[in-house]
Structure formats: structure tokens, C-alpha cells
A protein has these predicted regions:
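Structural/interface elements that position substrates and couple domains in central-metabolism enzymes
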Residues: 1-116
Length: 116
């Protein structure tokens, strides 16, 4: 499972109170393989999980190495994610928890979650 965004909000490396960290912990308990990307918070995350998860330097790599992906932090670069990129996921399932993307492509499974 690929996670895009680890910090509690964009433009910071702060992972304290980050939902992403709690989700990683839960996924690891369920024996899931987790792969992550974040422009700034990778090193702070690595201090917690060490080699228990995989780390990507480029967010695009998440799509080639994951069954599904979840957007957790609304980083500016993630707004460039295309349905073509999502189709590289084995399940073609992409979950946007921040409602920053919109797709009309019937060949992918796109779920947009959020409050309101």
C-alpha cells in the first residue's frame, strides 16, 4: 500500500499527530507492505519505522510499486497525479483523503474522502 504524504500538513516535516503515521502503524500490524513518499518528512518517518517500510524519492514510484495508493497530505506536487499514473497501480485503486484531485476515468477506482 502506497502512502503519499506523511507530515500532518503540507510544507512541513512535522509528523507529530500525523494520521499517516498512525495508518502506517495499523497497516504494519495487519502485515501489509507499506511504501511512502513525502517531500520533507521522509527522514523523520525513517527514524520511527527504520526498514519496516519502503521509502520513495519520487512520488511517481509509489504507483509502480503498490497495489493501491492513498493521498494523505495535500502537497502541491500531488496535484499533478494523473489517471495514467493511477493505472500503473495493480488494483487501479486511488484514495484521495484531501479532495485535491478529480477524475472521470472509468478505468480507475477513484475514491475522494473528506469532511463536509
Amino acid at each position: 500500500i502506497g502512502l503519499l504524504g506523511l507530515s500532518f500538513k503540507e510544507n512541513t516535516d512535522d509528523i507529530r499527530e500525523s494520521v499517516s503515521i498512525r495508518l502506517i502503524e495499523h497497516l504494519l500490524k495487519k502485515k501489509c507492505k507499506v511504501i511512502v513518499h513525502d517531500p520533507k518528512a521522509i527522514e523523520n518517518t525513517r527514524k520511527i519505522f527504520l526498514k519496516k517500510i519502503m521509502y520513495c524519492k519520487k512520488y511517481e514510484d509509489i504507483f509502480e510499486k503498490s497495489d493501491c495508493a492513498v493521498l494523505m497530505t495535500p502537497w502541491k506536487d500531488y496535484k499533478k497525479i494523473s489517471s495514467k499514473l493511477i493505472k500503473k497501480l495493480q488494483s487501479k485503486l486511488f484514495i484521495d483523503t484531501r479532495r485535491i484531485l478529480e477524475f472521470d476515468d472509468k478505468e480507475i477506482i477513484f475514491i475522494s474522502l473528506g469532511i463536509g
